[in-house]
Design a protein with these regions (language model features):
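Short Gly/charged-rich anion-binding patches and loops
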Residues: 99, 164-168
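Metal-dependent nuclease catalytic regions and adjoining charged, substrate-binding loops involved
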Residues: 27, 156, 168, 172-215
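Beta-strand residues in well-ordered beta-sheet regions across diverse protein folds
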Residues: 138-139, 181
Length: 215
C-alpha cells in the first residue's frame, strides 16, 4: 500500500513503538550504512568552516522582513563570527533532521530529491527532500518553536521566512500539499504541518519585489 505524507508521524510512532514492547526492528546493512555515511559527511562539513561569501538573496532568506534583508545585503560591518554554543546547536540540529528522515523511511514512506537544487528567477536554494512526492522541510525545534508546527500557528509567527521557503520549492516542483516535519529537540515529539495554500506567499511576485528593492 502506498503511504501518504499525512500519516507520516503516526506511521513512525507505530513502527518504532514495538521497541518499547521488547521487539527488534530489522534494518538492512545498506540502510544502516547510508545513515552512517550521512553522519560522517555531516561531521566533515561541520568541521570545515565556510569561507565568507557575499550576501545574496537565497531561497532560505527570501521570507525574512524586507528591511532586515536590505540591511543584511548592504551592511558593511565585519562579521563577528558564530559563537561556539551556536555551532554545537547547528551540528546536533542537522543530525536530528537526518534521524527524522531515517525514521520516515523506516516507517515505509518514500524519501526523494534530498538537497535538490532549485532556481527561481535567479534565486538558488536546496530543498530538504520530498516525502511521498510532496516537498517537505525538516525542522529541529525548541519546545517553544515546536508549538508553531504542532498547532499550525507558523503562518502567524514566521520570523525566519519558512513559509516563503516552502512555497518557493513547491512552485519549482509544481506541487501544493507539502509541509514541515518537525522534531522537538527537548522531547522527541514529531509534528507534521501542512499549511493551507492561501497562507503561502506568491513566490514569483515576492522575488520580483525583493529584487527591485535589494540591488
Amino acid at each position: 500500500m502506498t503511504k501518504k505524507l499525512t500519516t507520516v508521524v503516526e506511521d513512525i510512532y507505530d513502527r518504532i513503538g514495538v521497541l518499547g514492547q521488547g521487539e527488534t526492528i530489522d534494518v538492512c546493512d545498506k540502510d544502516l550504512d547510508k545513515f552512517a555515511e550521512f553522519m560522517k559527511q555531516a561531521l566533515k562539513d561541520w568541521l570545515t568552516p565556510r569561507t565568507n561569501r557575499e550576501p545574496t538573496l537565497r531561497m532560505s532568506n527570501i521570507g525574512k522582513p524586507k528591511r532586515q534583508l536590505w540591511y543584511d545585503m548592504n551592511s558593511k560591518r565585519e562579521s563577528q563570527g558564530i559563537p561556539s554554543p551556536v555551532l554545537i546547536k547547528f551540528l546536533y540540529g542537522h543530525i536530528l533532521e537526518r534521524v527524522v528522515l531515517f525514521l520516515t523511511e523506516l516507517a515505509g514512506h518514500k524519501v526523494t530529491d534530498e538537497q535538490k537544487e532549485v532556481k527561481i528567477s535567479g534565486i538558488l536554494g536546496h530543498m530538504d527532500c520530498k516525502i511521498d512526492g510532496e516537498v517537505v522541510d525538516i525542522k529541529s525545534a525548541s519546545g517553544f518553536a515546536f508549538k508553531k508546527f504542532r498547532d499550525g500557528s507558523l503562518p502567524d509567527d514566521d520570523p525566519f521566512g519558512y513559509m516563503a521557503q516552502l512555497a518557493g520549492y513547491e512552485h519549482s516542483e509544481e506541487t501544493t500539499d507539502g509541509g514541515f516535519l518537525a522534531i522537538n529537540k527537548e522531547t522527541g515529539e514529531l509534528a507534521l504541518f501542512q499549511p493551507d495554500e492561501l497562507d503561502k506567499p506568491n513566490i514569483p511576485f515576492k522575488i520580483e519585489e525583493l529584487q527591485k528593492i535589494i540591488k
